Design a protein with these regions (language model features):
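Flexible, polar/acidic helix-loop-strand segments at domain edges
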Residues: 102-167
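Structural helix-adjacent loops and short alpha-helical linkers that scaffold large soluble proteins
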Residues: 25-32, 179-189
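Structural signature of alpha-solenoid helical repeat junctions
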Residues: 2, 7-9, 159, 166
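Active/binding-pocket-proximal capping segment
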Residues: 37, 168-172, 181-197
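An aromatic- and glycine-enriched ligand-binding surface/loop that stacks and positions planar moieties
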Residues: 7-130
Length: 197
């Protein structure tokens, strides 16, 4: 129900538990727990660009996210502001590294949907201009909030929810655990679900 948005659900608890099991290298429990969670009605969002926009909050891929908003009394989240384009949408911290940019395969559309660039115009019509000649030229799409949705009373991006766990994470946890258990076919199938969305 809408009243439960932002609350920890059984799916979120199982998803986080499967991640803990994976970190503990208990691959059997990670596989079993993530498999149980995969049968709970979550799905991949077919539009990668939609995932991290405010319109994509609490979508089918959302397993757990922190609900943020603007309150005159308390302000809002600074997550997007800290990482936003310097002197335009934020402070410009935690920017994509060249290593991240080089990790994408040629032609992978996720690269352009992950990295904002100086001089780019977003699909919402915002021109990315850093305003500070010493600032970097790349920024994270994950924290971009269209200027039309900003509330100056709370700071840039104060409404942007924090995505803690997505269904794609669960598929990848399941894939890694399956691979470690020798079930390479299941691992490849789940990796390809994420890659081919």
């Amino acid at each position: 129900p809408a009243a439960d948005l932002g609350r920890v659900t059984k799916g979120a608890a199982l998803g986080l538990l499967s991640k803990v099991y994976l970190y503990m290298k208990d691959y059997q429990k990670a596989y079993e727990t993530s498999s149980t969670m995969m049968g709970m009605g979550y799905d991949l969002d077919p539009d990668f660009n939609h995932l991290f926009r405010p319109a994509g909050e609490f979508g089918p891929e959302s397993v757990f996210e922190v609900n943020c908003g603007c309150s005159p009394e308390f302000g809002g989240s600074q997550y997007a502001e800290v990482q936003g384009v310097r002197n335009q949408f934020g402070w410009g911290f935690f920017t994509p590294s060249p290593a991240l940019e080089n990790a994408f395969e040629p032609g992978d559309i996720r690269k352009e949907l992950t990295i904002l660039r100086e001089g780019e115009t977003t699909i919402e019509g915002d021109l990315i201009k850093k305003g500070d000649p010493q600032a970097v030229d790349t920024y994270s799409q994950k924290v971009y909030v269209p200027s039309s949705l900003n509330n100056n009373a709370c700071g840039y991006g104060s409404i942007q929810n924090l995505r803690i766990l997505r269904f794609a994470d669960i598929l990848l946890i399941n894939a890694e655990a399956a691979n470690e258990l020798g079930n390479t076919a299941a691992a490849i199938a789940n990796i390809n679900k994420v890659r081919n969305r």
